[in-house]
């Protein structure tokens, strides 16, 4: 059960890190008074999260190596 959850999380993180979509921040034009630039939508939050995953590719690679080691040593039968 724990092994399945760890594998699921690892695969999900890998999928987010290797996406090659051109994710750019949406440029909003300032409206002046009443500009609500502090709030962002769920889509923008997901986009920012996927962009941040790209910067952590080396750590994700190290996590993958650790998970392979755990799969062989701890979860192997």
UniProtKB/Swiss-Prot annotation:
Query: Extracellular face: residue ranges?
Result: 18-55
Task: Report the locations given in the UniProt record.
Answer: Membrane
Q: Name one GO cellular component term.
A: membrane
Q: Where the protein is mainly located, per its record?
A: membrane
User: So which residues are the signal peptide here?
Assistant: 1-17
Query: In terms of domain of life, where is this protein from?
Result: Eukaryota
Bilayer topology: Single-pass type I membrane protein
**Transmembrane regions:** 56-76
Report keywords, A-Z. Answer: Membrane, Signal, Transmembrane, Transmembrane helix
Topology feature Cytoplasmic, residues:
77
Q: Which family does it belong to?
A: Belongs to the SMIM7 family.
Q: PANTHER family in the record, alphabetically?
A: SMALL INTEGRAL MEMBRANE PROTEIN 7
Report what the protein is called. Answer: Small integral membrane protein 7
Q: Which gene encodes it?
A: smim7
């Amino acid at each position: 059960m724990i092994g399945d959850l760890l594998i699921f999380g690892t695969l999900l993180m890998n999928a987010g890190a290797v996406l090659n979509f051109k994710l750019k921040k949406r440029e909003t034009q300032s409206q002046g008074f009443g500009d609500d630039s502090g709030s962002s939508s769920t889509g923008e939050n997901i986009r920012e999260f996927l962009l941040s995953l790209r910067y952590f590719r080396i750590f994700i690679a190290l996590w993958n190596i650790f998970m392979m080691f755990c799969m062989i040593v701890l979860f192997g039968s």
